[in-house]
Design a protein with these regions (language model features):
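Basic, polyanion-binding surface patches
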Residues: 1-147
Length: 147
């Protein structure tokens, strides 16, 4: 099957957007993800997938902890910036991002599985912070949209 055809078909399904962070060498490495999903409530496990060819693959594959930030409709500019221009943020920027997000999940790596051309990360949620009643940022037809 052609990858472009598959991507086109799957782009018809709207998904939520998260930013995954992992801190190394004083900075937060960041990646925008639409493959985030809940896996288990007890224990609390979530997952997301990363292409092995991604420039960010090595950083996330080797980390022990990750923070999942569920992005709000006020973070479209930030999502585009991370997705297309930048992959690291400072402590100050990270804290500003958290203030605008819907909520933050502080996680430890539970399991990593190689599937095809991707790795799936299973994360155990250790702490949930900042649940706010604001609308999410979504991804549909290859664009970030707000509801």
């Amino acid at each position: 099957m052609k990858v472009d055809k598959l991507k086109s078909a799957l782009s018809n399904y709207p998904t939520g957007i998260v930013c995954v962070f992992s801190k190394t060498k004083g900075f937060y490495n960041a990646i925008i993800v639409n493959s985030f999903t809940s896996v288990s409530l007890n224990p609390p496990i979530v997952s997301w997938c990363l292409d092995k060819k991604s420039s960010k693959f090595k950083v996330f594959k080797n980390c022990k902890n990750q923070t999942i930030v569920i992005l709000s409709n006020k973070q479209k500019k930030f999502a585009n910036h991370i997705a297309f221009h930048r992959d690291k943020v400072s402590d100050l920027e990270f804290n500003k991002i958290l203030k605008m997000s819907i909520c933050d999940l502080y996680c430890a790596i539970f399991k990593k599985i190689k599937i095809g051309d991707h790795f799936t990360f299973f994360l155990k949620i250790k702490k949930i912070s900042g649940i706010k009643k604001i609308k999410p940022l979504v991804y549909y037809k290859k664009k970030f949209l707000t509801i």
